[in-house]
């Protein structure tokens, strides 16, 4: 799993797969190359951001999902951008969705900056109130000024040999996510709307309206973190917290886990833990995008995470990326039958 099944006991947050954030990606949009001057960054590039959620299937022994393919109508889906390194949102893209009615659903999107980006609800400039959610694979993008958006059911780009991991890392060569689908939100955003500097931090969250309040149900920046390192009894709490508190909350416990799991020295374990704390995906747009610098759809983050946990002792799983990826927006493949 990447961030799939991130609640305690390998369940969905709130026992609802629509609240399960599965993956987050950040990479340069093809044709929108990044150009950088020596003294001042000349921002002519475009960054692609993708938030996936709502996995349509689950490998054993995880119980199969029972809810539908739509976005949750009472949830707030958010992509947060930190532009100054303080683990606080300076920019936020927020999405809500209508009720699912006879196979039809529509989204509303907002773009917030400054203090508004740190408010949990949908605030800021409304980009669109008529974002069509596609369930049949047809791409229905909306152009909101300089930002391109799309939402719908897509093929899950994550690939992993779960059976092999459950059997002592004797890899089987089987991709348990080959036929999985997810709900995907894709954006192309001009770089000059993502801060002045080349480095950004990205994380996503899904919150649920409950008793008049927004309750954060899932969150993540780096792939394969919460389901991999936090023990049961800690996962739900982790999902409810904010990245700004991660170092204080998790540096000690995670360093100890890494010492025990990978044979790291205490100093090495601390350094390894700080590679993913706070849990924010860092992306330097002056450098090629491959995890841990941003994340592209072909990154083998499953193997990367096990190597991190084991201090290089667990070999790569040997799987290849999915062959249905697109070279153009929205980049993920059409949904599997």
Q: Where would I find each of the regions flagged by the language model?
A:
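Surface-exposed extracytoplasmic segments
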Residues: 1-337
């Amino acid at each position: 799993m990447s961030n799939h099944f991130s609640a305690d006991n390998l369940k969905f947050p709130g026992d609802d797969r629509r609240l399960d954030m599965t993956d987050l990606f950040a990479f340069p949009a093809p044709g929108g190359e990044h150009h950088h001057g020596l003294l001042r960054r000349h921002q002519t590039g475009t960054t692609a951001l993708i938030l996936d959620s709502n996995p349509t299937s689950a490998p054993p022994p995880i119980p199969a999902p029972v809810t539908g393919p739509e976005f949750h109508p009472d949830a707030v889906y958010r992509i947060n951008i930190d532009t100054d390194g303080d683990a606080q949102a300076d920019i936020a893209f927020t999405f809500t969705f209508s009720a699912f009615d006879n196979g039809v659903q529509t989204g509303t999107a907002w773009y917030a900056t400054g203090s508004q980006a740190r408010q949990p609800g949908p605030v800021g400039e409304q980009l669109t109130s008529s974002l069509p959610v596609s369930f049949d694979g047809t791409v229905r993008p909306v152009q909101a000024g300089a930002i391109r958006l799309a939402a719908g059911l897509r093929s899950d780009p994550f690939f992993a040999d779960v059976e092999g991991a459950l059997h002592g890392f004797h890899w089987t060569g089987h991709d348990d996510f080959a036929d999985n689908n997810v709900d995907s939100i894709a954006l192309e955003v001009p770089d000059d709307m993502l801060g002045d500097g080349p480095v950004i931090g990205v994380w996503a969250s899904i919150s649920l309206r409950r008793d008049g309040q927004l309750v954060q149900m899932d969150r993540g920046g780096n792939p394969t973190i919460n389901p991999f390192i936090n023990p049961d009894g800690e996962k739900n709490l982790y999902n409810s917290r904010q990245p700004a508190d991660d170092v204080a909350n998790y540096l000690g416990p995670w360093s100890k886990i890494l010492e025990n799991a990978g044979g790291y020295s205490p100093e090495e374990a601390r350094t390894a833990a700080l590679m993913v704390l706070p849990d924010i995906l860092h992306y330097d747009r002056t450098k090629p995008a491959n995890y841990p610098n941003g994340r592209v759809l072909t990154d083998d983050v499953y193997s990367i995470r096990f190597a991190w946990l084991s201090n290089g002792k667990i070999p790569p799983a040997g799987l290849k990326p999915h062959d249905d990826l697109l070279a153009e927006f929205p980049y993920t493949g059409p949904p599997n039958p």
